[in-house]
Amino acid sequence: MDAISLYNQTTLECSKLITERYSTSFTLGIKTLAKEFHLPVYAIYGFVRYADEIVDTFHDQDKQALLDRFKKDTYEAIESKISLNPVLHAFQLIVNEYKIDLDLIEAFLHSMAMDLDFKTYNDSKYHEYIYGSAEVVGLMCLKVFCKGDDAEYQRLREPACKLGAAFQKVNFLRDIKSDYEERGRVYFPGV
């Protein structure tokens, strides 16, 4: 294995470790997929996990500045096809290999920024947040699963979005107490 291949593999394995440490259920889900999809999905999870950590964890930091830097670094990694941040390097490998649309990444990062700006959500913001925080993550994974078959991607796009939205709503229910008590957030409109 040459040096760049070793670096690429190591960064992908970092994302696998992040997934294993942060989500045993997601790790188990990934293991049900064909082996060829494991590392790409770990890379997507590593990216979304770190963005989520910025908005949910680093309370003594300027979260907006951290998220802005993460966003800038993400796009630089994708464009230059390299990053010294192992999570972003692994993610850019998958974005570039599977041609993941930048608008999906932008929608995701926008939803992360919404967590900094909104504490309660009306119907419109609720659906906007779910699209960016969950549906687009499913669409990124769908790009991997379809391996460039655009017709198959379009056929499965709507069901993938519905599945992502359902998972997010379950997460909202699971975390309703901590979201409110620790972060002051209420995602469900009218609650």
Task: Tell where the protein language model's regions lie, with residue ranges.
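Acidic catalytic motifs of isoprenoid enzymes
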Residues: 1-191
